[in-house]
Amino acid sequence: MNIEEFFELSAGKWFSHRTSHHLAFKQSEDGKSDLVIESLAADHPEVIKLCELYEVPASAASCGARVSWNGTMEWDEEKHTGSTVLATVPDVDNPNEGRLLREMGYAEKAPVAGRYKMGDDGALTLTTEYETMWSEERLWFASPNLRMRVSVLKRFGGFSMASFTSEIRMGGSPAAAKAEEAANSASS
């Protein structure tokens, strides 16, 4: 599977349940969110605008997505809502790796570019260095309607967090054959 197929398979409405382990505090926290992921073509105006923000030629982008979320975390009463646009810019010599441009980062509320790598097993690994922290996230399809995610967040001062997230598709299912193929390659 390539990055474009991964984004296409991710399109839809998802229920997300995350357990985060705050290692320094030796505590865990649950969170729940509703996610909406919309696949965007490489020539979509929002993808082009994002490329311009990073001074990347729009023609270098291979695909994009708009991700919106609305959720809660166990430790606070605040609603966690937001949205961001993503764009992929594959490396010229290896299109299974490249830059992932984000309109807004998840850990810090500012534009941030990271790296992506599509594995032979159909899993997507994202690595991002923020100003004060580093994150690595791995996403894969366990089945056409179940996506898994594990992540590690490490602050430069030493504080770190590990998370496991399961995402259940609530609507907007992908083409069954592609989704089944992705799930089979991830489990083998």
UniProtKB/Swiss-Prot annotation:
Q: What induces it?
A: Constitutively expressed.
Q: Which CDD domains match?
A: CpcS
Q: Which InterPro entries does the entry mention?
A: Calycin (IPR012674), CpcS/CpeS (IPR018536)
Q: Which domain of life is it from?
A: Bacteria
Q: How is this protein's function tied to pH? A: Optimum pH is 7.5-8.0.
Keywords from UniProt, A to Z, are: Lyase
Q: How does activity depend on temperature?
A: Optimum temperature is 45 degrees Celsius.
Top-tier EC class: lyase
Q: What is its EC number?
A: 4.-.-.-
> Biological process GO annotation list?
protein-phycocyanobilin linkage
Known regulation of activity? Inhibited by Co(2+), Cu(2+), Ni(2+), Zn(2+), beta-mercaptoethanol, and non-competitively by imidazole.
Q: What is the effect of changing R149L?
A: Loss of catalytic activity, retains PCB binding
A GO molecular-function annotation:
lyase activity
Outcome reported for the amino acid change (mutating R147Q): Reduced lyase activity, reduced binding of PCB
Name the family: Belongs to the CpcS/CpeS biliprotein lyase family.
Q: How does it assemble?
A: Monomer.
Q: What does this protein's UniProt record list under function?
A: Catalyzes the site-selective attachment of phycocyanobilin (PCB) to 'Cys-82' in CpcB and 'Cys-83' in PecB. Also able to add PCB to ApcA1, ApcA2, ApcB, ApcD and ApcF, but not PecA. In vitro can be made to add phycoerythrobilin, a non-physiological substrate, to its target proteins (using genes from Fremyella diplosiphon PCC 7601). Binds PCB extremely rapidly, followed by a much slower phase of PCB transfer to the apo-acceptor protein.
Name-wise, this protein is Phycocyanobilin lyase CpcS 1
